[in-house]
């Protein structure tokens, strides 16, 4: 998971910097990254007011983000240097612009990691439903005349992990704000489906 987060941060920063250089974003400079960060925080405020993991997810998210920002960027003087050179002109301003965008993008990934943490129960529920559904279909096949397919079992089993990781990686890395439920609910459904297929196609007799 740590590797996925690190890769997502590096990928997101690279895409953001290329977008700034190429003029892809409607907002100038670091404005695009700041807008995405604000929008991502709004998803927590509006859609994750309750959680099975944290009693106060909104307050917890802001506390975690503030703590990380203060420890990594404020205490080291990085944030103040960027602020001081944000309108100084020349190379210093360019460095400050790209640096501030990198900070904001890193915080966006952190917010999304927190959102993923809040959606862990969703993936657990999808996995449980998938296992139960698969076991029921396996028993029907076991006591009936159903045929086994090692091909389906091995391919479904092999895809389960990559689909889970790839879904997280894409969600963490997209350079624009996306509704978490729009993306993560289908991912959880696909994850549960693969588990169901894997469990249901497991050989009838051990």
Task: State the predicted function of each range.
Residues 14-64:
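Juxtamembrane non-transmembrane segments of integral membrane proteins
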Residues 1-10, 182:
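Alpha-helical transmembrane segments and their helix-start/interface "positive-inside/aromatic belt" motifs
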Residues 3-7, 99-138, 187, 191:
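Hydrophobic alpha-helical transmembrane segments of integral membrane proteins
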Residues 132-188, 193-206:
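Hydrophobic alpha-helical transmembrane segments and adjacent short intramembrane/lumenal linkers
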Residues 60-120:
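Individual transmembrane alpha-helix segments
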Residues 1, 99-105, 157-167:
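Short hydrophobic alpha-helical membrane-embedded segments
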Residues 1, 91-94, 101, 105, ...:
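Extended alpha-helical regions
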């Amino acid at each position: 998971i740590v590797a996925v987060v690190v890769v997502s941060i590096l990928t997101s920063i690279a895409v953001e910097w290329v977008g700034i250089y190429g003029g892809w974003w409607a907002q100038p400079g670091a404005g695009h990254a700041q807008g995405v960060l604000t929008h991502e925080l709004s998803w927590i405020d509006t859609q994750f007011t309750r959680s099975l993991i944290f009693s106060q997810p909104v307050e917890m998210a802001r506390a975690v983000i503030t703590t990380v920002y203060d420890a990594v960027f404020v205490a080291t003087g990085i944030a103040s240097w960027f602020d001081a050179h944000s309108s100084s002109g020349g190379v210093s301003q360019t460095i400050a612009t790209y640096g501030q965008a990198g900070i904001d993008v890193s915080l966006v990934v952190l917010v999304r990691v927190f959102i993923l943490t809040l959606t862990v129960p969703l993936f657990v529920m999808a996995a449980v439903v998938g296992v139960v559904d698969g076991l029921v279909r396996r028993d029907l096949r076991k006591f009936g005349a159903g045929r086994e397919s090692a091909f389906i079992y091995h391919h479904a089993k092999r895809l389960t992990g990559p689909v889970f990781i790839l879904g997280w990686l894409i969600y963490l890395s997209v350079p624009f704000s996306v509704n978490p439920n729009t993306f993560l609910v289908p991912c959880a459904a696909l994850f549960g489906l693969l588990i169901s297929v894997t469990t249901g196609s497991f050989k009838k007799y051990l």
